[in-house]
Design a protein with these regions (language model features):
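Short, strongly hydrophobic transmembrane alpha-helices
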Residues: 4-32
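Mid-to-C-terminal secondary-structure elements
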Residues: 116-136, 146-206
């Protein structure tokens, strides 16, 4: 009798674990593929992550990321997409330009942050919730003006509040004007996740 109870308990626990695992996988799949803010148009988007160059009649090839010239002459010239937005990869930026540190003027605190470079169309393709200010404009992006958008947690950590549009911060000792502050986003939204966003040309130079 006791043995039957033991096996019954094992079956129940095993079934429960199996169901829980399937549900967890389904939830993760939904989060990674569904249209969830700020990635509200995943089902309509295409991504260009790398460029492959072939030479010697296709016998050799060279793979690389999308450089500024390719972006300007090819991607921005596409007519089929409704919008073309360009970003840097925040996860690999430390390997390309080194660690990124941000500091409020006069403060001794200089936390390391995850920074993403982007263009002005980024804010039209992705739907962020602005708590203060607004994204940097096209003219600011094209002229390379040092602008930055912070997430809520970083703004509060640096300046103690979220109403900070128009104030300045130092990113690797370069002064940036805060354009706006957005609600924190989940790291699950890996294509747009960062703590601060700057015009991408400046992002590479920081």
């Amino acid at each position: 009798m006791g043995q039957n109870r033991f096996f019954t308990a094992v079956y129940i626990i095993g079934t429960g674990l199996a169901i829980s695992m399937v549900m967890a996988i389904a939830v993760v799949y939904h989060i990674r593929t569904a249209n969830i803010a700020p990635e509200v148009s995943r089902d309509r988007m295409g991504y260009v992550l790398n460029v492959s160059y072939e030479f010697n009649g296709g016998k050799g090839s060279l793979n690389s990321g999308c450089g500024p010239r390719f972006v300007k002459e090819v991607l921005y010239g596409l007519e089929t997409p409704e919008k073309v937005a360009v970003t840097t990869n925040a996860a690999i930026m430390p390997y390309e330009v080194g660690d990124i540190f941000i500091q409020a003027p006069g403060s001794d605190e200089s936390p390391k942050v995850q920074l993403m470079g982007c263009d002005d169309a980024f804010w039209q393709v992705y739907r962020f919730s602005f708590l203060d200010g607004k994204p940097f404009a096209s003219a600011e992006f094209l002229s390379g003006m040092p602008r930055v958008v912070l997430d809520r947690s970083l703004a509060r950590r640096l300046l103690g509040r979220t109403e900070v549009a128009g104030q300045t911060v130092l990113i690797n000792d370069i002064e940036y004007t805060i354009s706006g502050v957005v609600e924190d986003i989940s790291a699950v939204a890996s294509d747009v996740y960062a703590e601060a966003w700057v015009p991408y040309k400046i992002g590479r130079a920081s």
